[in-house]
Amino acid sequence: MQIDLNADLGEGCGNDEALLALISSANIACGWHAGDAATMVQTVKWALARGVAIGAHPSYPDRENFGRTEMQRDPEHVYADVLYQIGALDAIVRAQGGVLHHVKPHGALYNQAVRDPALARAIVRAVRDFDADLVFFGLAGSQMIDVAKEAGLRVKQEVFADRGYNADGTLVRRGTPGALHEDEEVALDQTLTMVREQRVRAIDGTWVPIRAETVCLHGDGAHALAFARRIRERLGAEGIAIRAGD
């Protein structure tokens, strides 16, 4: 058995180089919610040195709120936004001799696309039009994944180690009870259950089927690095290999 571990990097958290030793895929901020050209260049350099798969992490234009504020943005504008950000990171990756592997939307853009098919189609169209060989990372079991598949893209269904789930398989909204697992043991147990049993316990106590193909480890928490080490060790002890795959 194998699983991909991904983390959102280039966001100014100061632990990117160390995290890259523990993950298999990196989602690099493209300057619209965090980071800038210099951080993109440096993060790509570190990722290439570690052999980590590199992905673009496009967002709404929202540096003030770290891309976590929902916007009512025209789908054509979103298409252009995402296309622009993918192109910027791709140029940096190519300049250093690498190849862009995937795209994962960030924050509010990601969460809204789970609920809004027009938004999901705009994001997916930008990815496909840029390079139809890119892998699309999206919330496991969501319509965002369905839209990407319908467009002919390869997908990785993403689960979250430290986030709470609703009974419909969506993430509990940040700022509400149960949104984040502060207890590392709870997060570790949830991750192992999702990977091995392909299910997750929702906040109402029900079990929800879930397809875990890549696990997101948030890189911006106070204990992100220590948790990443623990989850890697726990997966290894269970005989689960960590690789990006195709």
Curated annotation (Swiss-Prot):
SUPFAM superfamilies: Glycoside hydrolase/deacetylase. The keyword Transferase does not apply. Pfam families: LamB_YcsF (PF03746). Keywords: ATP-binding, Hydrolase, Nucleotide-binding. Coiled coil: none annotated. GO terms for biological process: carbohydrate metabolic process. InterPro entries: Glyco_hydro/deAcase_b/a-brl, LamB/YcsF/PxpA-like. Its EC number is 3.5.2.9. It catalyses: 5-oxo-L-proline + ATP + 2 H2O = L-glutamate + ADP + phosphate + H(+). GO terms for molecular function: 5-oxoprolinase (ATP-hydrolyzing) activity; ATP binding. It comes from the Bacteria. Catalyzes the cleavage of 5-oxoproline to form L-glutamate coupled to the hydrolysis of ATP to ADP and inorganic phosphate. Forms a complex composed of PxpA, PxpB and PxpC. Belongs to the LamB/PxpA family. This is 5-oxoprolinase subunit A. It comes from Cupriavidus taiwanensis (strain DSM 17343 / BCRC 17206 / CCUG 44338 / CIP 107171 / LMG 19424 / R1) (Ralstonia taiwanensis (strain LMG 19424)). The lineage of its organism: Bacteria, Pseudomonadati, Pseudomonadota, Betaproteobacteria, Burkholderiales.
